[in-house]
């Protein structure tokens, strides 16, 4: 089981440049051009077809190397200068000329974007039309997982015929009790978990970028500025909120710096790491304990997202990554089994109603809230103040509460997700046609 934990962490905790949904689209486009083996001039048209959740998360977020937002510019950047061997850092090292060509391709209408009628959360299909023939790429389930490659009618890869890594829905880790996972992590030698520390400096650097005036919404900077003025206290909770929000401010506005992602999300990685970093800085936590705390946080994030989906109507930063951070912080405080159980109940009793309405600069507000609630939930649980069984969705155990969260996400939030997407598409159409509509009418969107 130790080996599976390490394999899962190495698969799910990886660097990413830019919001992972548009970056995954860029990755698919870069791969399509690679297998096609053609120059940009030879490409007649590009069709990008994505799941509703990928569309939602990529609609309003800044894309590195440009002042543009959305999936079309991400696709264009992937075509002109993307390096698919770099995975979710596909846009690293792009040249200015490649960026300019990408903007030109988008302006020319070379790229068409459509939504696929699918229940898949992560689904990206790219079709390059090249002088009478096509190249096709499909990414599914994970943002960097190619499941289908085709060139000129010849299938180069089909995941249905190739045995591979355990799919996330088959991972036995997610069917274990949480206390068992933590007990195994506690026994893993430090040298085998030392790679967890890679995300600390990476995500702190993004936070430092966001602490400059005028970055994103300025949520992190506002905390920092008011702490300097003495309006806010320089305590663990405000430090966690400041760092976490600042990193999101920078990332959502299109910073070219990488962050360490978690379970396919850079913002999840920020939330899973930086509240723990704030605690570690305040209490001088040694690297060995910090690495184990980070492993706990990332695995709790993946554990919960196994039940609610990688992308959903619920904000993964709040309900999954925030819960992971809270469990890890409580563990650093010396929490026992009952207190760990209580942390999860406290978190999900608090933030389970936080919706995901796409990636955007406003996410910094939700990340700040998630960091604050993570500290609060840990402190309450350490003092044995735990939401009682039967309060709302809170069950007798943490695992039962997570199962209730799954029911909320899968059965209760489908119409919510459709309504969110409907509203966002209305805004998008108004933006594209330069029409300002003061009253948004409800549209029915059926997946």
From Swiss-Prot:
Superkingdom classification of source: Bacteria
An annotated GO BP: L-cysteine catabolic process to pyruvate
Disulfides per UniProt: none
Molecular function via GO: L-cysteine desulfhydrase activity
Family under the similarity heading: Belongs to the UPF0597 family.
Protein name: UPF0597 protein Amet_4665
Source species of the chain: Alkaliphilus metalliredigens (strain QYMF)
Highest classification ranks of the organism: Bacteria, Bacillati, Bacillota, Clostridia, Peptostreptococcales
